[in-house]
Amino acid sequence: MSTYTRPVMLLLCGLLLLTLAIAVLNTLVPLWLAQANLPTWQVGMVSSSYFTGNLVGTLFTGYLIKRIGFNRSYYLASLIFAAGCVGLGGMVGFWSWMSWRFIAGIGCAMIWVVVESALMCSGTSHNRGRLLAAYMMAYYMGTFLGQLLVSKVSGELLHVLPWVTGMILAGILPLLFTRIVNQQTQARHSSSISAMLKLRQARLGVNGCIISGIVLGSLYGLMPLYLKHQGMANASIGFWMAVLVSAGILGQWPMGRLADKFGRLLVLRVQVFVVILGSIAMLTQAAMAPALFILGAAGFKLYPVAMAWACEKVEHHQLVAMNQALLLSYTVGSLLGPSFAAMLMQNYSDNLLFIMIASVSFIYLLMLLRNAGQTPNPVAHI
C-alpha cells in the first residue's frame, strides 16, 4: 500500500491552506494591536490567550473525533478558526481580541490534533516517519509562504481578513472529496490523555515533544530578538530566519525516511547531538550559516520523530489519545521555553539562548542513551 494515499494527500493540501492563514494572522495580529496603541503587556496577553486556546482545544478533540469522526471534526475545527478570524473585524480592543484569539487557538489546536491523528491512524510503524515528515513539510511550507504573503500584500486589517477567511474555508474543500476512516470507533476501551502521559514505554517520546517545544518555541520567538541585538537590519533578520525554516523543511523527508529504516531511537540520538553542536557553533559566531542550517534541520525534526516513537508503543485505538498527549506536551514546552530563555537573556546574556537549548538537549540525550534499544515489534503495527 502506498504511503501517500489519496486521503493523505488531500488532508495535507487542506493543511497547507490552513497553515498559510495561521502564519499570516500570527504575524499581523501583534502589529494590528500595536497600531491600535495597546500597551505591550496587553499584546502579550492576547498572544497568551491564543496559546491557552491551543491547550483547551488539544484536550477535548480526541472525544470529538471518537463521536463524529475525522472529517466532521476537521470541518468543525476549520469553522471555529474561521469564526475567530472574522471576529477580529468587529472591534479592535483588548478583551474582544483576547476572546477571538482564544477561539482561534482552540480551532487551530483541533486542526492539528485531527490531522496528526488521521495520519497516525492511516500509517503503520514502517511509514509513520515519512507521513509525519510530509505533514511537517506542508506545515513549514505553509508558514514560509505565509510570511511571503505578509510581505507582498496590504497589511490593513479589513483588507486581510476577507481573503484569510476565504483561505480557511478553502482548506475545508479537499476533505469534501474523501473520507478518513476512524478505526477507533470499534474499540471497546477508550484511553485518556493522562494515561498516555504516564505510559512508561512511551516516555521518551513524550519527553522529546516537551524538549522540541522548548527548542522550537525559543528559536521561533527569540531568534529574531537575538539577531536584532547583534545589530542586524530587519531584512537580514528575515534572511536568517528563512535559512532556519528552509533547513527545517529540507530536513524533514530524509530524516523521516532514515527513522523508518534505521529506527527512531538512533535517529533521535543523532538529531539531539546535532542540535547541541549547532547551539555551540552559534555561540562562536564564526559560521552562522552552517550553524543555523544544522540547527534548523535537526531541531525542526525532533517533534515528528519523537511522536512516531511514542505512537509505535501503543495500541492502534490509543493513537488519538497519544497524539493529544504529545501535542499537549509540545505546547507546554513551547510556552515554558521562550519564557525562561527570555528571562535569562534579559538578565544575563543573549548567548544564554543557545546555552539553554544545548543544556535541555543534552539532558534529553542522556535519557536517550540510557535506553538500551527499541521494541523489536512495535505495538501499533497495523
UniProtKB/Swiss-Prot annotation:
Molecular function GO terms recorded? transmembrane transporter activity
Would the keyword Membrane turn up in this protein's UniProt record?
yes
Membrane topology term: Multi-pass membrane protein
* Coiled coil regions, renumbered to chain: none
Alphabetical UniProt keywords: Cell inner membrane, Cell membrane, Membrane, Transmembrane, Transmembrane helix, Transport
The principal location of this protein is membrane
Q: Which Gene3D superfamilies match?
A: MFS general substrate transporter like domains
- Give GO cellular component annotations, separated by semicolons: plasma membrane
- Specify the domain of life of the species encoding this protein: Bacteria
Q: Which residues cross the membrane?
A: 8-28, 45-65, 75-95, 102-122, 131-151, 157-177, 204-224, 231-251, 274-294, 325-345, 349-369
**Which cellular compartments is it found in?**
Cell inner membrane
- Assigned protein family: Belongs to the major facilitator superfamily. YcaD (TC 2.A.1.26) family.
Q: Which HAMAP family match?
A: MFS_YcaD (MF_01149)
> Could you identify this protein by its name?
Uncharacterized MFS-type transporter YcaD
